[in-house]
């Protein structure tokens, strides 16, 4: 989990993704459309991808991708992120983390 914590704390928003996952694509698109430039970790293309996926599963990510971290803290997977977006909470989290300037 150390590698996940280290990567998650490097930017205001970090998305652990798989390049072939449609939900990962949708979540990345959501953040781009909000004006956020997240760090993207494509675990299927990372040499430590299996270790990262295992660590995400231990955090409770099911499915393991997309896993979204804001301000170094695990926010959730696609369902949670979409819920936060729809109820307006996601923008608040992004502002607090310094990822969004509006």
Curated annotation (Swiss-Prot):
It is found in: Cytoplasm; Nucleus. GO terms for cellular component: cytoplasm; nucleus. May only reduce GSH-thiol disulfides, but not protein disulfides. [2Fe-2S] cluster binds at residue 21. This is Monothiol glutaredoxin-S10. A motif (Responsive for interaction with TGA factors) lies at residues 99-102. The keyword Cytoplasm applies. Keywords: 2Fe-2S, Cytoplasm, Iron, Iron-sulfur, Metal-binding, Nucleus, Redox-active center. It comes from Arabidopsis thaliana (Mouse-ear cress). Belongs to the glutaredoxin family. CC-type subfamily. One of its GO terms (biological process) is negative regulation of transcription by RNA polymerase II. GO terms for molecular function: 2 iron, 2 sulfur cluster binding; metal ion binding.
């Amino acid at each position: 989990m150390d590698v996940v914590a280290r990567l998650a704390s490097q930017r205001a928003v970090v998305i652990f993704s798989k390049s072939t996952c449609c939900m990962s694509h949708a979540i990345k698109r959501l953040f781009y459309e909000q004006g956020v430039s997240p760090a993207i970790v494509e675990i299927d293309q990372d040499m430590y991808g299996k270790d990262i996926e295992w660590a995400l599963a231990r955090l409770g990510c099911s499915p393991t991708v997309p896993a979204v971290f804001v301000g170094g803290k695990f926010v959730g997977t696609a369902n949670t992120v979409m819920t936060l977006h729809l109820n307006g909470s996601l923008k608040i989290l992004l502002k607090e983390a310094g990822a969004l300037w509006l």
